[in-house]
């Protein structure tokens, strides 16, 4: 296993190291991510590196009791194992994540031809209010932190400027 890694050029070794660190940090890699500049989904470099060296990475993680899996239909590579501890999400991030899942499922059920949806912060906060999980509207700082956290984990991509968050801010 080490021989395989040592035979790679230094750039590839560095790419594999970055992929391993990303998987340990967020436990998954997405095949495609929304590129705001181009206005469309783009393939991610990390996913391609992981796919190219999948067998090596599978053995690498197996040595630590961690399973590396790929879901081709969802465009996802992820790790699983009892020794993994994910980051604890703040309450608002958890609420937004669950509401986003509901909105996504509803739009997919309405025979959407796209695998991503566009919604607004107003729609998310409105749904959270309907379910009674938000008693008051969160502060702009708390919303900004939550959106930044979900963006970091590649759950959402704001279409509008992050500093100008309001109810009409669009999210993919």
Language-model regions, residue ranges each:
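DNA transaction DNA-binding modules
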Residues: 52-53, 68-71, 107-111, 121, ...
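Short alpha-helical segments that sit at the start of domains
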Residues: 10-15, 81-118
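Short acidic, hydrophobic short linear motifs in intrinsically disordered regions
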Residues: 34-44, 111-130
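A short, conserved structural fragment
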Residues: 62-70, 147, 151-164
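Eukaryotic partner-binding/assembly regions in large regulatory complexes
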Residues: 1-82
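Short acidic, glycine/proline-enriched loop segments that cap or flank alpha-helices
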Residues: 108-116, 134-138, 159-160
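Short, cationic-aromatic polyanion-contact patches
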Residues: 80-83, 161-172
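Short amphipathic alpha-helical interaction segments
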Residues: 49-57, 134-152
């Amino acid at each position: 296993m080490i021989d395989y890694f040592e035979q790679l050029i230094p750039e590839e070794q560095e790419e594999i190291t970055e992929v391993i660190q990303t998987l340990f940090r967020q436990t998954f890699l997405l095949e495609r991510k929304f590129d705001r500049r181009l206005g469309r989904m783009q393939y991610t470099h990390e996913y391609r590196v992981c796919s190219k060296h999948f067998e090596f990475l599978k053995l690498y993680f197996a040595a630590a009791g961690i399973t590396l899996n790929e879901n081709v239909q969802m465009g996802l590579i992820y790790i699983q194992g009892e020794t993994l501890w994910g980051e604890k999400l703040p309450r608002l991030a958890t609420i937004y994540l669950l509401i986003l899942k509901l909105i996504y499922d509803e739009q997919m059920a309405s025979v959407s031809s796209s695998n991503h949806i566009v919604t607004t912060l107003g729609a998310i906060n409105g749904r959270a209010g309907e379910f009674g999980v938000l008693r008051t509207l969160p502060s702009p700082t708390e919303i900004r932190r939550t959106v930044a956290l979900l963006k970091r984990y590649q759950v959402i991509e704001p279409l509008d400027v992050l500093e100008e968050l309001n109810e009409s801010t669009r999210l993919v």
